[in-house]
Amino acid sequence: FQVAIAARTVPDLPFGRLRANRQLLEIGRDQLAFDADETRTLAARTGYRLNREQAEALAERTEGWAAAIYLAALARERHAASVTEAGDVSGREGYIAEYLRSELRPILEDDITFLTRTSILDVVEPKLAEAVSGLPDAQERLVRLARANLLIGEVAGPETTWRYHHLLRDHLLWELA
């Protein structure tokens, strides 16, 4: 038999044996990221027609995040002046900022403080994040926030470092200012 679990956050279930036996298919943010063609198709559903160059710019700026692509296209179609170019998308205002605010609202105040203060870092290294934020347990906090799918990803490399999605970081920096 087969079981499918779809969840926004990674469930705390014992997947080790299934993973070891190659009986587990995990689909994450990287696999769900839209490419330029998929971006074009999604934008067209809002009535916003993109050429190839615009679709590539929007896919790159949103890192393929479907919700951001849709919201940017919707904003462009409904309020042409708010987004002049497909790649001119930010987390500072409009539909994307509204979405990010609603996603951050249920987060603990310390976590919001941590995210906002550490948004000044291009790459978030846990010890540096603790120094910048003034809050302890950065590594555990980053793991927990990443598991909650808050647009935080681990950067591959010899040291454990993290990176915030461009639009999330843009939003947090705007809030910090």
Spell out what each predicted region is.
Residues 90:
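Active-site diphosphate/adenylate-binding microenvironment
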Residues 42-44, 56-61, 67-79, 85-86, ...:
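C-terminal helical "lid" of AAA+/P-loop NTPase domains
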Residues 8, 53-55, 97-174:
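C-terminal boundary/linker of central alpha/beta nucleotide-binding cores
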Residues 1-75, 94-101, 167-174:
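Alpha-helical sensor/transducer elements of the RecA-like P-loop NTPase core
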